[in-house]
Curated annotation (Swiss-Prot):
Descriptive protein name: Aspartate carbamoyltransferase catalytic subunit
Role of this protein: Catalyzes the condensation of carbamoyl phosphate and aspartate to form carbamoyl aspartate and inorganic phosphate, the committed step in the de novo pyrimidine nucleotide biosynthesis pathway.
Signal peptide (UniProt feature, chain positions): none
Domain of life, per lineage: Bacteria
Annotated keywords: Pyrimidine biosynthesis, Transferase
Pathway assigned in UniProt: Pyrimidine metabolism; UMP biosynthesis via de novo pathway; (S)-dihydroorotate from bicarbonate: step 2/3
Residues engaged in binding carbamoyl phosphate: R55, T56, R105, H133, Q136, L265, P266
Binding site residues for L-aspartate: K84, R166, R227
Lineage, broadest ranks: Bacteria, Pseudomonadati, Pseudomonadota, Gammaproteobacteria, Aeromonadales
Catalysed reactions, as listed in the record: carbamoyl phosphate + L-aspartate = N-carbamoyl-L-aspartate + phosphate + H(+)
UniProt similarity note: Belongs to the aspartate/ornithine carbamoyltransferase superfamily. ATCase family.
InterPro entries named in the record: Asp/Orn_carbamoyltranf_P-bd (IPR006132), Asp/Orn_carbamoylTrfase (IPR006130), Asp/Orn_carbamoylTrfase_sf (IPR036901), Asp_carbamoyltransf (IPR002082), Asp_carbamoyltransf_Asp/Orn-bd (IPR006131)
Length: 306
């Protein structure tokens, strides 16, 4: 079978089709069960993080090394020639000449797409501002499939910051290809953007808006939590909003035994630590799955057959 991701840039989740996503999930599942240390043998990946990152950068570097590849790069754009005024286009041209693929995070929206236009090797977006974070979506899809055994027809709630959270935008767009039903739970000021809702309506995807988690809890297969960003509100308003969207043990009353809680992390106060010990909590395993999803994507982008 032809590998459709071979030598492909992955900048946005919309760059991938449903079969592409299913291929990444299946490959991640296989690599988690049967590690293969040869898939990136003799491959050199450039890890270019112009913006600080913990989980994304370390999981990519772990993924490369566990597949037998080598990695070069930087974790702080302030220590590169960008500080001297070098353009991103020039930087990527040079970095691409040293490597087989570039993994990049950048604070500016659209930076990854720009980089792909000047790179002779595949560029994988590790996050560009509040725009896109496709590999987070892929690890979310893998985690959902791992816990539910499928992606089709699930009931998924998104809670918290639905306006600025790039993870919820991308995941909603991806899951819309699998005919899932969505429940949006957020402060009015942080509601899901109109363009996402309009896109879902055009596709015939069912979604509804709610004020509390409790009113939909019994229906859910996946509860996707996000943090309300403190910096976007004054102290009084933040405390009011944040307190309204905290997941506690009592909130979980009536949940399906198979329901799982996901969170892109970092967690602040929106999930009580007591929830960590319940069988519903899956956010730490979700973060671990980032290694396998990124292994799968790198292997597919850099190998004609996997």
């Amino acid at each position: 079978m032809t590998n459709p991701l071979y030598k492909k840039h992955v900048i946005s989740i919309s760059d991938l089709t449903r079969p592409d996503m299913e291929l990444v999930v299946a490959t991640a599942q296989r690599l988690k069960a049967e590690p293969d240390t040869r898939l990136l043998k003799d491959k050199l990946i450039a890890s270019c993080f112009f913006e600080a990152s913990t989980r994304t950068r370390l999981s990519f570097e772990t993924a490369v090394q566990r597949l037998g590849g080598n990695i070069i790069g930087f974790a702080d754009g302030g220590n590169t020639s960008a500080k001297k005024g070098e353009t991103l286009a020039d930087s990527i041209k040079i970095i691409g000449s040293y490597s087989d693929a570039v993994v990049m995070r950048h604070p500016k929206e659209g930076a990854a797409r720009l980089a792909s236009e000047f790179s002779r090797v595949p560029v994988i977006n590790g996050g560009d501002g509040s725009n896109q974070h496709p590999t987070q979506t892929l690890l979310d899809l893998f985690s959902i499939h791992e816990t539910q055994g499928k992606l089709d027809g699930l009931n998924v709630a998104f809670v918290g910051d639905l306006k600025y959270g790039r993870t919820v935008h991308s995941l909603a767009q991806a899951l819309s290809l699998f005919n899932c039903r969505f429940f949006f739970i957020s402060p009015d000021a942080l509601a899901m953007p109109d363009y996402i809702c309009e896109e879902l309506e055009e596709k015939g995807i069912r979604f509804s808006v709610h004020e509390t988690m409790e009113e939909v809890m019994p229906e859910l297969d996946i509860l996707y939590m996000t943090r309300v960003q403190k910096e976007r509100f004054d102290e009084t308003e933040y405390k009011h909003m944040a307190a309204k969207f905290v997941l506690e043990l009592a909130t979980l009353e009536g949940a399906k035994p198979t329901m799982k809680i996901l969170h892109p992390l970092p967690r602040v106060d929106e999930i009580d630590v007591a929830v960590d010990k319940t069988p519903y909590a899956y956010y730490f395993q979700q973060a671990e799955n980032g290694v396998y999803a990124r292994q799968a994507l790198l292997a597919l982008v850099l190998n004609e057959t996997v």
